[in-house]
Structure formats: structure tokens, C-alpha cells
Amino acid sequence: MGSGTAPKGRRNHTPTHIKCRRCGKRSYNIKKGYCASCGFGRSRRMRKYSWSHKWKKKRNLL
């Protein structure tokens, strides 16, 4: 039939992302080995960009 629900049902049920050791968010990719939120595992510096203002709001810098 189609390639909708059935292939998704056969997918592996282990989580892609787990809790990050540095930022605490559930965005550490097990296969890639780095955090999508803070960049842990890829760089020593915290991942932040000028186009992303949530981190500024969190620290009351705006």
C-alpha cells in the first residue's frame, strides 16, 4: 500500500535523543554523539547564535 504508518511501526524503538549532561535538555543525539541544543560533544563552547534569542531571554539579557 503506502509508506505511512507501517514503516514507522517497524522502526527501532530506542530513543534518538537522551538527556544532555551539560544543559539537561533531551537533545543529546546518541548516534551523532553531540547535543543539538548546547553543542556538547562537538565543541567546548556553548552553542548559541544571534538568530536564536531564547538563550538571551533565559538569562534576562534582552
Curated annotation (Swiss-Prot):
One of its GO terms (molecular function) is zinc ion binding. Binds 1 zinc ion per subunit. The keyword NADP does not apply. Keywords: Metal-binding, Ribonucleoprotein, Ribosomal protein, RNA-binding, rRNA-binding, Zinc, Zinc-finger. Zn(2+) binds at residues 20, 23, 35, 38. Signal peptide: none annotated. A zinc finger (C4-type) spans 20-38. Its cofactor is Zn(2+). InterPro entries: Ribosomal_eL37, Ribosomal_eL37/eL43, Ribosomal_eL37_CS, Ribosomal_zn-bd. SUPFAM superfamilies: Zn-binding ribosomal proteins (SSF57829). GO terms for cellular component: cytosolic large ribosomal subunit. PROSITE patterns: RIBOSOMAL_L37E (PS01077). One of its GO terms (biological process) is translation. It comes from the Archaea. Belongs to the eukaryotic ribosomal protein eL37 family. Binds to the 23S rRNA. HAMAP family: Ribosomal_eL37. This is Large ribosomal subunit protein eL37.
